[in-house]
């Protein structure tokens, strides 16, 4: 991977030797950075920022100017696919994303088509191309999508939810309708991620934020089955290089063996699982990403370093196969200097594990 100045992240995902543990942060481009807030105010609103390739690239690169991160992640949103399907995405102040036309029945599912990644979603591909150009080979670029199940929760609920009653009603009363929707979404995600890879994404990640609200059997049937379909459909080699894929189910620690069996390269872990246990269970099959509680970034520097040391020790001295990250996105009111302490601690404290 000679064109990359720093390929630590990709090497760790492929379990190749690295000099120290690579690190990046979910939501590393975001509201905790004053420069992000300034750029967003220029764009006007969140989706305008996503749809402007130059500004999306600017906010993607902002955290890399502050911190020696080992990867950049595309600045976008998981709801781009349902938005492109015509559901009318909008953001209510203080309430998060909502849809004007949620999915309520089979007729609604029949109506939606698969968006063209270089048509309705071309703005995402333009952002990928712009970011790759602006990165100048410094670090790899991660592309991403929401999982079919997680996208479906927003589409059926009409926005965020705490109890997920609407989608669970569909799941138990009209399972065939939900499977039809999930199948369409899986096909869309495959096309979308493959287009990101062709546009320049060097690794991809599927975020299954709400898989953890399901029973074990429902998780297999309504979430994992469709992520497996995505893994099977992805371009796994591009431009002469392997394109690693990471699956992340929040609150999915009980299902690591099943997730590893999809053929993914890595599993993202949240903070509710001990990384030593995870490594014992599936470390021979996949790399692991995670898994510090993002709230620890509110602590004093020494406490942050202590937590980093604990997680590194838990993963052990295999020398590779671990990408350090938070267990979910960084909180918007974390002091940026604390994020810097975290990133520096990972690089410094992991070196003895990579001799």
From Swiss-Prot:
GO cellular component: cytosol
Subcellular location: Cytoplasm
InterPro entries per UniProt: UROD/MetE-like_sf (IPR038071), Uroporphyrinogen_deCO2ase_HemE (IPR006361), Uroporphyrinogen_deCOase (IPR000257)
Source taxon at top rank: Bacteria
Pfam families assigned to the protein according to its UniProt record, in alphabetical order: URO-D (PF01208)
Marked site (Transition state stabilizer) residue numbers: 77
Binding positions (substrate): 27-31, 77, 154, 209, 328
EC code(s) of this entry: 4.1.1.37
Record keywords: Cytoplasm, Decarboxylase, Lyase, Porphyrin biosynthesis
Top enzyme category: lyase
Functional description taken from the UniProt entry: Catalyzes the decarboxylation of four acetate groups of uroporphyrinogen-III to yield coproporphyrinogen-III.
Assigned protein family: Belongs to the uroporphyrinogen decarboxylase family.
Name recorded for this polypeptide: Uroporphyrinogen decarboxylase
């Amino acid at each position: 991977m000679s064109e990359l100045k720093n390929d630590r992240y990709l090497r760790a995902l492929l379990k190749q030797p690295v000099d120290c543990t690579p690190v990046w942060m979910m939501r590393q481009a975001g509201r905790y950075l004053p420069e992000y807030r300034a750029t967003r105010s220029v764009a006007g609103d969140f989706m305008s920022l996503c749809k402007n390739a130059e500004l999306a690239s600017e906010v993607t690169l902002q955290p890399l100017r502050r911190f020696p991160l080992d990867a950049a992640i595309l600045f976008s949103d998981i709801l781009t696919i349902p938005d492109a399907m015509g559901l009318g995405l909008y953001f209510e102040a203080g309430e998060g994303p909502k849809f004007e036309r949620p999915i309520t029945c089979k007729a609604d599912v029949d109506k939606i088509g698969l968006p063209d990644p270089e048509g309705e979603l071309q703005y995402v591909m333009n952002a990928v191309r712009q970011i790759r150009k602006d990165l100048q080979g410094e670090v790899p670029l991660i592309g991403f999508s929401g999982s079919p199940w997680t996208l479906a929760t927003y589409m059926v609920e009409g926005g965020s939810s705490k109890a997920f009653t609407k989608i669970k009603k569909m799941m138990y009363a009209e399972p065939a309708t939900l499977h039809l929707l999930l199948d369409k979404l899986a096909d869309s995600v495959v096309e979308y991620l493959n287009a990101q890879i062709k546009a320049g994404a060097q690794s991809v990640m599927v975020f299954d934020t709400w898989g953890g609200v399901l029973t074990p059997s429902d998780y297999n049937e309504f979430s994992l089955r469709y992520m497996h379909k995505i893994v099977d459909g992805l371009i796994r080699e591009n431009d002469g290089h392997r394109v690693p894929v990471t699956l992340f189910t929040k609150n999915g620690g009980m299902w690591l063996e099943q997730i590893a069996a999809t053929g993914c390269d890595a599993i993202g872990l949240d903070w509710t699982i001990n990384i030593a246990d995870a490594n014992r269970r599936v470390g021979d099959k996949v790399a692991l990403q995670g898994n510090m509680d993002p709230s620890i970034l509110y602590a004093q520097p020494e406490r942050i370093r202590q937590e980093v040391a604990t997680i590194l020790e838990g993963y052990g001295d295999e020398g590779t196969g671990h990408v350090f990250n938070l267990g979910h996105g960084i909180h918007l009111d974390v002091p940026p200097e604390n994020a810097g302490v975290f990133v520096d601690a990972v690089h410094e404290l992991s070196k003895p594990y990579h001799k």
